[in-house]
């Protein structure tokens, strides 16, 4: 006999786990389906692990300048990349364990496996059919690997990486070419430059951090350049040949090399495989209204998969809003 729930949430990131906990606290019988580890991109492959790297970089730079504060050190200041990665893993594990504890404490049934959404009323996990009155899709997004000549081959060799692979790289790169000057690219540029890597950012737009206010963009670009990071704007990558990146700037093609090449050109909603539901889409993004409802009754979509604002705190608020709408609690609606 199938288990029955009021709400099944597919995806255990910030939107999914917050929605699940909130629904349970409101008294609903709720299940959360996650194929990897709860916490999503933010806790496992994004916000949190990158901040641990930034903290290590900050400590390293502070110690190097310790004499400015009247503190002397003996010998040359160095770093152990494997220990930096290990510390990152420890912080991530601590936080994801905390999320798992909160889910259990609040009585959420967690299913580890791929959630196959058959309809608004059925989700199959590991061959088990779960029945529900409502489904919340919180499947997140994945980094885009652009169809630039040579990128696929270099990606398969581990030379081209996305942010997810770069967080777990074992051999520290002495040089790195970063394609894309958005938040992710700039964050990694800051980290690797701090530890002494030669860093080059290639950005198609007229400046880095294109979604930020101009005052911030200009000021931070100056800071990065002062610290030795090369920033190439209005530049387009034409091809990749193993460690070599050829780009076009002002009508002239130039080739540079890097131990690693980071592709940070954006993300794409994880909506593949949901076509049979008849969802209204905007490219890969699932269209939703202010209550996070899709065009299919009983199906909601929150977080990166709806493509509105791909930020963890936005996903969390969307999750709460969707749950309140399902359970008819209050009159909350999203106002971006």
Swiss-Prot record:
It comes from Acholeplasma laidlawii. Its cofactor is FAD. Pfam families: Pyr_redox_2 (PF07992). The keyword Disulfide bond applies. Binds 1 FAD per subunit. It catalyses: N(6)-[(R)-dihydrolipoyl]-L-lysyl-[protein] + NAD(+) = N(6)-[(R)-lipoyl]-L-lysyl-[protein] + NADH + H(+). Transmembrane segments: none annotated. Its EC number is 1.8.1.4. FAD binds at residues 34-42, 51, 115, 304, 312. Belongs to the class-I pyridine nucleotide-disulfide oxidoreductase family. GO terms for molecular function: dihydrolipoyl dehydrogenase (NADH) activity; flavin adenine dinucleotide binding. Disulfide bonds join 42-47. Homodimer. This is Dihydrolipoyl dehydrogenase. Keywords: Cytoplasm, Disulfide bond, FAD, Flavoprotein, NAD, Oxidoreductase, Redox-active center. GO terms for cellular component: cytoplasm. Lipoamide dehydrogenase is a component of the alpha-ketoacid dehydrogenase complexes. GO terms for biological process: 2-oxoglutarate metabolic process. PROSITE patterns: PYRIDINE_REDOX_1 (PS00076). InterPro entries: Class-I_Pyr_Nuc-Dis_Oxidored, FAD/NAD-bd_sf, FAD/NAD-binding_dom, Pyr_OxRdtase_I_AS.
């Amino acid at each position: 006999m199938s288990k029955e729930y009021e709400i099944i949430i597919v995806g255990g990131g910030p939107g999914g786990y917050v929605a699940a906990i909130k629904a349970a606290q409101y008294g609903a019988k709720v299940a959360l389906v996650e194929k990897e580890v709860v916490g999503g991109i933010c806790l496992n492959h994004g916000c949190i692990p990158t901040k641990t790297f930034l903290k290590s970089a900050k400590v390293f730079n502070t110690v190097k300048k310790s004499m400015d504060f009247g503190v002397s050190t003996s010998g040359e200041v160095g770093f152990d990349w494997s220990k930096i990665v290990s510390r990152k893993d420890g912080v991530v594990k601590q936080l994801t364990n905390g999320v798992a504890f909160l889910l259990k404490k609040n009585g959420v049934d967690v299913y580890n496996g791929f959630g196959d959404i058959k309809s608004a009323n059925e989700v199959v996990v590991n061959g088990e059919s779960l029945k529900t009155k409502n489904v919340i899709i919180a499947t997140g997004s994945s980094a885009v690997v652009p169809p630039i000549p040579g990128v696929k081959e270099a990606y398969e060799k581990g030379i081209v990486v996305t942010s997810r692979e770069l967080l777990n790289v074992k051999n520290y790169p002495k040089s790195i070419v970063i394609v894309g000057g958005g938040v992710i690219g700039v964050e990694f540029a800051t980290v690797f430059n701090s530890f002494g890597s030669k860093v080059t950012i290639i950005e198609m737009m007229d400046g880095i951090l294109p979604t930020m206010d101009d005052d911030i963009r200009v000021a931070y670009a100056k800071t990065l350049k002062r610290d030795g990071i090369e920033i190439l704007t209005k530049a387009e990558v034409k091809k990749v040949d193993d460690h070599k990146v050829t780009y076009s700037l002002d009508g002239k093609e130039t080739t540079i090399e890097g131990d690693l090449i980071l592709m940070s050109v954006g993300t794409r909603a994880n909506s593949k495989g949901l076509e049979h539901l008849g969802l209204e889409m905007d490219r890969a993004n699932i269209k939703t209204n202010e209550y996070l409802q899709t065009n299919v009754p009983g199906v909601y979509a929150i977080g990166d998969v709806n493509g509105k604002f791909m930020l963890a705190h936005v996903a969390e608020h969307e999750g709460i809003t969707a749950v309140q709408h399902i359970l008819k609690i209050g009159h909350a609606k999203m106002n971006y």
